[in-house]
């Protein structure tokens, strides 16, 4: 059995409902519904969720670990939430959050406007910092990757949009 799939999920302040092939996790920050693969059994034991494969096949074993990680992320998301921090490096690079839009000045001849999907919020504590928050880990990471994709860090000066914890290795310029 999968090592990840064996460990139970603690439901710290989250309610879980199992209904016809789907699990709904409800918490103080919102609700996430996730389809459960038929090769995985989910059991709710007062305060913890236990997942187990239906049979001893490799696929069921692998999916039990995957489903456990996805459900654990949903529980974490509805109780504490997820956030991803981005930093803008470069002269004149600025960000401004306006409602569900993120306005970016990234050295192009036009401003870049990124529309935030439902359930995701962007904050700009300073003009060069962006904090993307939400309850769905996958969506938060996807939006952060899309924003970074507008101007990824270049290898010579390091200018561009980077994750706050990202280390950009700079190349040396050509010498004559």
From Swiss-Prot:
It comes from the Bacteria. Keywords: Ribonucleoprotein, Ribosomal protein, RNA-binding, rRNA-binding. The keyword S-adenosyl-L-methionine does not apply. GO terms for molecular function: rRNA binding; structural constituent of ribosome. GO terms for cellular component: cytosolic large ribosomal subunit. GO terms for biological process: cytoplasmic translation. Gene3D superfamilies: Ribosomal protein L6, alpha-beta domain. InterPro entries: Ribosomal_uL6-like, Ribosomal_uL6-like_a/b-dom_sf, Ribosomal_uL6_a/b-dom, Ribosomal_uL6_bac-type, Ribosomal_uL6_CS. It holds the Pfam family Ribosomal_L6. PANTHER family: 60S/50S RIBOSOMAL PROTEIN L6/L9, LARGE RIBOSOMAL SUBUNIT PROTEIN UL6M. This protein binds to the 23S rRNA, and is important in its secondary structure. It is located near the subunit interface in the base of the L7/L12 stalk, and near the tRNA binding site of the peptidyltransferase center. Part of the 50S ribosomal subunit. Belongs to the universal ribosomal protein uL6 family. This is Large ribosomal subunit protein uL6.
